[in-house]
Amino acid sequence: MSRAAGMRKPGDLAGGARLAGLLVGLGLLLGGCAAPLPEADTSPAAEAAFEARTAQLEALDSWRLVARLGLASGEEYWSAQLNWRVQEGQHVLDLSGPMGRGGGRLTLSENGRALLVTRSGERFQAQDPDALVARVLGESIPVSGMVYWVRGLLHPEASYQLDVDADGRPLEIHQSGWTIEYNEFEEIDGLAMPVTMVLEREGVELRARIGRWQLGGDPS
């Protein structure tokens, strides 16, 4: 028996609503329209500018960002607020939203060990932060890569493909199976820092809009 055109099953309606909500959520996350970024520049001067920017950022042992995240995987979508603080090699990421959908804190020590504490007080530890987050959230989030990518840097232990503009700002990074696209920057203390970025891999899309950067000083 064929189904009449224009008639939908309840499941179809629910799926459509989920998809619509996902698209609206991702659209709202990126906010207004940013000015288009310039074309990629393959000149030695552009490469040197990227390396100079990298050296300046790597020299900072403390920084902080506040951002909104949106992750889409299949028909699943969640959003979260992120407060990421770094001081003397220790990363503290406070998330409101996921981790049992109640939020929690992820701490990365200088030796690479990860500790995740949910809002309900559950504690999880692992040497691999990506595997730890995937086990607790059930989603693939490349935390170890984002330590670098969120600042527009390359992970030093992975092969890569990179596009930069004439000023040395990253436009697109391909690394560890992820594509990271940068859509907007702002100047913070003389450095171009990402404002909006999109990470994609095998049907997973993670978007970030950074509302605040602090470079150096006390990030608490």
Which residue ranges define each predicted feature?
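Bacterial Sec signal peptide processing site at the extreme N-terminus
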Residues: G27-E51
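Extended lipid/amphipathic-ligand handling interfaces
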Residues: L82-R85, R105-L108, N183-E187
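An acidic-aromatic
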Residues: Q90-S140
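Solvent-exposed loop/turn segments connecting transmembrane beta-strands
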Residues: S73-Y77, P98-G103, E202-G203
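Gly/Pro-enriched, hydrophobic low-complexity segments
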Residues: G152-S220
